[in-house]
């Protein structure tokens, strides 16, 4: 899996430039020639759209303008990648809704698997034209990590515009030292990351480390390297990393548990009491209505929700899971015994609010 940010593809005068993309394409070709399968997650559609209608970003609502620019630039982005390869390049646009919904998640995995079987090169981007919440900091970094797990990738390579992770921002701190090997993403390591590193893209080093943590939970190592350096990219094509290696977690979690842990969450939560919290965290139990204190938001049956301990600072999030009942239903059955569900609601989807197979403790 290779993630390429828009700062490596955007031309100084607007639009897209093959300057750094060519070297990255050669890295891809070297891996393909070695018999490896590869998927690209590429930003750059908005930057390409700005060259087509430069004034679009100055007119109308900011989100709507970015969505329009993404629609304008997506074809140019795919054309940029296609020019480097003889094999067909397949455009795949995803949103967090696709990754949140289990059925669509599995369909996306099946489609990507078939594209790879057919010898195509999938190029994935966020479907910014229909996304709203997703147009946020570092979205494609996190998207790359989730897709890496989705396709069972062996490694996640993130091309950036600096030489990897440093102990501090090397552009402002001359004492910053490079970190070649990161065995574990500790709070101290995360604190070394600053904010957004580019005027073009939306992701900084912090989001790249968050992506590495998500990939690591699936047993996937992450490699950060400078995509602007031809020497670095050529060395990488020969399996020599000049950047930062971030090790995967020692304990790999099951694919479904990974999806439960990292799939985007609906704007909702189930509030539970101390007894339910102890049962979830200590016994691996399902969540029953008797331990439920209430619900936040307006989620539906089958939505991914957070499970929070009530009466704590910020309602501490203990777990995530797929709710068997809507927020409205949960408010009505909260604190009741499971056998009362049908009498209260007039129907029942089972005794559990969240079954343990659909739940992961954080």
UniProtKB/Swiss-Prot annotation:
Instruction: Read off the InterPro entries from this record.
Output: AceGlu_kinase-like_sf, Asp/Glu/Uridylate_kinase, G5K_ProB, Glu/AcGlu_kinase, Glu_5kinase, Glu_5kinase/COase_Synthase, Glutamate_5-kinase_CS, PUA
Tell me one GO molecular function of this protein. Answer: glutamate 5-kinase activity
Q: Where does ATP bind?
A: 3, 160-161, 202-208
Q: What's the Enzyme Commission number for this chain?
A: 2.7.2.11
Q: What is its main location?
A: cytoplasm
Cite the binding residues for substrate.
43, 128, 140
User: Which PANTHER family does the UniProt entry name for this protein?
Assistant: GLUTAMATE 5-KINASE, ISOPENTENYL PHOSPHATE KINASE
Family according to the record: Belongs to the glutamate 5-kinase family.
What's the name of the protein? Glutamate 5-kinase
* Taxonomic lineage of the native organism: Bacteria, Pseudomonadati, Pseudomonadota, Gammaproteobacteria, Lysobacterales
